[in-house]
Amino acid sequence: MNFRKILTITLLSFSFAVYQVGDQISQGDQDRVFEVCYGAEHHGIEPVGGRYNLTLGDYNGFTNDTGIFYVLMIDMAASWWGPCWNNIGTMVGIEGYYEDNPNVKIITNLDDIGQPYSCQQWGDRHQFYNPDVFPLMTDDGNQDVLWSWLNTGG
């Protein structure tokens, strides 16, 4: 009986997201700034006020300065969750597969950084698998922003 309750609560948590598959992300949410905590310099992101930032709008040809549209894959990872840590090798393979396609961008969005792994440790683990692939990582700031937007149960 308890298993059913837990399963029901878990499944319901996935239904309360801002965006569902096929939804257009609002301009306000596209403009929300996320701190890049790893890989900015390898992805052409310039610091602003000493910080590296990105927005989802940076990859939208209607709103960015280049007019180029990108396919954006966002890997959602929690630093405390073992399966996310173990998934790094798979992500490196995906990143390596698309690294020569300038219109595909892959971002790892980290939540709960420092519990136990830092952004630097996460990036270094990527580099361990393939030193030629530089991941791009953002810090969700323990606010569960992207987690709640994209139906991950955050």
Which residues are covered by each model-predicted region?
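Structural recognition of the beta-strand scaffold that forms the well-ordered cores
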Residues: 72-76, 104-110, 134-138
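Short beta-alpha junction loops
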Residues: 110-116, 140-142
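Boundary/junction segments of secreted and surface-exposed precursor proteins
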Residues: 18-36
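Conserved redox-active cysteine motifs that mediate thiol-disulfide chemistry
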Residues: 68-92, 113-115
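Short, solvent-exposed loop/turn and secondary-structure capping segments
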Residues: 84-88, 118-121, 148-149
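Short, internal strand/loop/helix patches
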Residues: 121-154
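A short beta-strand-turn-helix
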Residues: 31-72, 93
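Sec-dependent N-terminal signal peptides
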Residues: 3-15
